[in-house]
């Protein structure tokens, strides 16, 4: 009898959990919006949630199946979102009528110190004030000074590669996991430019900054699980006061920044890094920012820059090894730039003048976009209409909007032969043909990425140094189908980003 009661209880519990997991799935049926059938718990994100596919691939394939609809219902796990497939509608929501959609959706439910103080998470006037405070931090003039710090990290990376080539005398080049190498580079650049800390993760791969930083990245196993849990059961996550990040590790980064600020103020020390720029911005702002709010802007580099900058270098070098004509043309521009420097170190201005470099990076950002999508949250009821005034949809306060960046980037209506790597799409002659709001590598509207200059100068600087000294070729372990082999948030193959580097001299 007891066994029967236990079985019945389990059946009831299982049924209740199932009903909870599907409770939102009638949303679009009731609001008369086309949608694809979702699955319990995972919605329309089954493959990505189970890490059998990358988020980019899952979202792009969803877009390809539904792109004939200007708007379509989409379930991010249990959360209903309205996807805007039409560029003109994206313009309306993200630019023209921004006041109705000024915020991002709650990315995750977090009880973590610092997380809710990040610019990308802030809302309304608080976000606006911080954005205005930070905008002068990312001007070309400020990035120009910071580039000198990046040059030091580029040099250390090249020294490491040079040492690797010398350990294999007589061989034509050597194999390297570009992802591992670029993670260390990204880490060291963030350490010096955002936290005022000098580390060399090639000579000392066990340094505290690198190991703690690696453990905080969302794509890592435990962090990924916690992220998915906070997305699936946000109220429970908040109620139990669970945290995604180890508080001791968060405190480590906070302590680095606060102690650096205190030391510099006491000894009147300046350095062209993010801490210095934030200190100056804080002093010039009418708002009274707390230390945690300042620290959070440095902390965001681990989420906005660490993986993204590393992956952009990896996907670009991946394309260069499979497109040797592009690689050779870029190398020729690099050699010309090197000659023009006349023995001087690489500068921010020199990098900015490299037109083909910019075309290559732009095409890489199109084909292998850093963020598969961006989002908005409706803050005021809003009726979305077509150009002729036809009503398309009534948005309610709290509705979440999905902008399918990767889908737009790979849509053959906007980019012919979208799977082809063709930097000439971004030539002066052709880029004017691009349909507005179909190319969104750094987001769209007032809430676009504030740090795009920072990201681009790091990637361009590293590619300049790498291609100047090495030719990139395929190795036996080079992945052939990156699209099909990647999983998680970014295009990182499970087996690694292996490539063969051949010294040019």
UniProtKB/Swiss-Prot annotation:
This is Cytochrome P450 9b2. The lineage of its organism: Eukaryota, Metazoa, Ecdysozoa, Arthropoda, Hexapoda. Keywords: Endoplasmic reticulum, Heme, Iron, Membrane, Metal-binding, Microsome, Monooxygenase, Oxidoreductase. Its cofactor is heme. The gene is Cyp9b2. Its EC number is 1.14.-.-. It is found in: Endoplasmic reticulum membrane; Microsome membrane. It comes from Drosophila melanogaster. Pfam families: p450. Heme binds at residue 449. May be involved in the metabolism of insect hormones and in the breakdown of synthetic insecticides. Its main location: endoplasmic reticulum. GO terms for molecular function: heme binding; iron ion binding; monooxygenase activity; oxidoreductase activity, acting on paired donors, with incorporation or reduction of molecular oxygen.
């Amino acid at each position: 009898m007891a066994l029967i009661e236990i079985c019945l209880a389990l059946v009831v519990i299982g049924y209740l959990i199932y009903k909870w997991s599907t409770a939102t799935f009638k949303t679009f049926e009731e609001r008369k919006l086309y949608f694809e059938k979702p699955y319990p718990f995972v919605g329309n994100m089954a493959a990505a949630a189970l890490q059998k596919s990358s988020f980019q691939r899952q979202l792009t394939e969803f877009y390809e199946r539904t792109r004939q609809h200007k708007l379509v219902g989409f379930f991010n796990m249990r959360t209903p979102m309205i996807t805007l497939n039409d560029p003109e509608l994206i313009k309306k929501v993200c630019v023209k009528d921004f006041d109705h959609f000024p915020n991002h959706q709650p990315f995750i439910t977090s009880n973590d110190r610092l997380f809710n103080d990040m610019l990308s998470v802030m809302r309304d006037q608080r976000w606006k004030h911080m954005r205005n405070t930070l905008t002068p931090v990312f001007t070309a003039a400020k990035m120009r000074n910071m580039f000198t710090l990046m040059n030091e990290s580029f040099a250390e990376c090249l020294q490491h590669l040079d040492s690797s080539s010398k350990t294999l005398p007589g061989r034509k080049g050597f194999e390297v996991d570009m992802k591992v190498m670029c993670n260390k580079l990204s880490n060291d650049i963030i350490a010096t430019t955002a936290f005022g800390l000098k580390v060399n993760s090639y000579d000392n791969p066990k340094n505290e900054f690198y190991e703690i930083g690696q453990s905080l990245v969302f794509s890592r196993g435990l962090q990924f699980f916690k992220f998915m849990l906070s997305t699936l059961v946000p109220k429970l996550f908040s109620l139990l006061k669970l945290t995604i990040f180890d508080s001791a590790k968060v405190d480590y980064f906070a302590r680095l920044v606060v102690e650096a600020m205190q030391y510099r103020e006491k000894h009147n020390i300046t350095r062209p890094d993010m801490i210095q720029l934030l200190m100056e911005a804080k002093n010039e702002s009418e708002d009274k920012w707390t230390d945690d709010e300042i620290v959070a802007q440095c902390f965001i580099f681990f989420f906005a820059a660490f993986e993204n900058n590393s992956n952009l270098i990896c996907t670009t070098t991946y394309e260069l090894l499979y497109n040797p004509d592009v690689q050779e043309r870029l190398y020729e521009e690099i050699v010309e730039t090197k000659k023009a420097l006349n023995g001087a170190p690489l500068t921010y201005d020199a990098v900015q003048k490299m037109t083909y470099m910019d075309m290559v990076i732009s095409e890489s950002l199109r084909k292998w976009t850093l963020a598969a999508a961006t989002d908005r949250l409706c803050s005021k009821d809003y009726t979305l209409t077509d150009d002729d005034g036809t009503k398309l949809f009534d948005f309610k306060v709290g509705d979440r909007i999905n902008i399918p960046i990767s889908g737009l980037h790979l849509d053959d209506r906007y980019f012919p032969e979208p799977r082809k790597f063709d930097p000439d799409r971004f030539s002066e002659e052709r880029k004017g043909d691009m349909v507005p709001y179909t190319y969104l590598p750094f987001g769209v509207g007032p809430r676009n990425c504030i740090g795009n200059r920072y990201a681009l100068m790091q990637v361009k600087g590293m590619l300049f140094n790498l291609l100047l000294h090495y030719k990139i070729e395929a190795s036996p372990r080079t992945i052939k189908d990156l699209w099909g082999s990647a999983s998680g948030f970014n295009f990182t193959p499970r087996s690694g980003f292996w490539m063969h580097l051949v010294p040019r001299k």
